[in-house]
Curated annotation (Swiss-Prot):
Principal subcellular localization: membrane
InterPro entries the record matches: FluC
Family per record: Belongs to the fluoride channel Fluc/FEX (TC 1.A.43) family.
Listed GO MF terms: fluoride channel activity; metal ion binding
Designated gene of the protein: fluC
PANTHER family (alphabetical): FLUORIDE EXPORT PROTEIN 1-RELATED
Top-level lineage group: Bacteria
Entry GO terms, CC: plasma membrane
Residues binding Na(+), per UniProt: G74, T77
TM ranges: 4-24, 33-53, 67-87, 97-117
GO biological process: cellular detoxification of fluoride
Protein name: Fluoride-specific ion channel FluC
Reactions this protein catalyses: fluoride(in) = fluoride(out)
A Pfam match: CRCB
The organism of origin for this protein: Acinetobacter baumannii (strain ATCC 17978 / DSM 105126 / CIP 53.77 / LMG 1025 / NCDC KC755 / 5377)
Length: 126
């Protein structure tokens, strides 16, 4: 009964720690479009794409899916952080940079989700 809750909680802790670490290390490199936020959204898109395909063909306990998708990816990806970064750019009058950041996050995440799906099918030989 508690395994789903524990699965989500443990995945969330690990995802949040990784998000914090990548933000700490990568955001100072190019603050106009914080690379930590971009990285976690792209990596999260890849992981969720791969995981969805994997779990669709797996007999593993649903708790593993909760751990990876709901917990880890849910804590790793950063829509709220992305939103405030875009609003800050807009408030600073940096409309072009805001549109570039939106494009990178949205298109990049979709591409990386597709790459994750494709990677699973390539690895699994489907």
């Amino acid at each position: 009964m508690y395994y789903p809750l524990l699965s989500i909680a443990l995945g969330s802790v690990l995802g949040a720690w990784l998000r914090w670490f990548l933000g700490l290390k990568l955001n100072p490199i190019y603050p106009q479009i914080p690379l930590g936020t971009v990285t976690v959204n792209l990596v999260g898109g890849f992981i969720i794409g791969f995981a969805m395909a994997y779990f669709a063909h797996s007999d593993l306990s649903p708790n593993y899916k909760l751990f990876v998708i709901t917990g880890f990816c849910g804590a790793l990806t950063t829509f709220s952080t992305f939103s405030i970064e875009i609003v800050t750019l807009l408030q600073s009058g940096k409309w072009g940079m805001a549109m570039l950041a939106i494009s990178i996050h949205l298109i990049g995440s979709l591409i990386f989700t597709c790459l994750g799906l494709a990677a699973y099918y390539w690895v699994a030989g489907h």
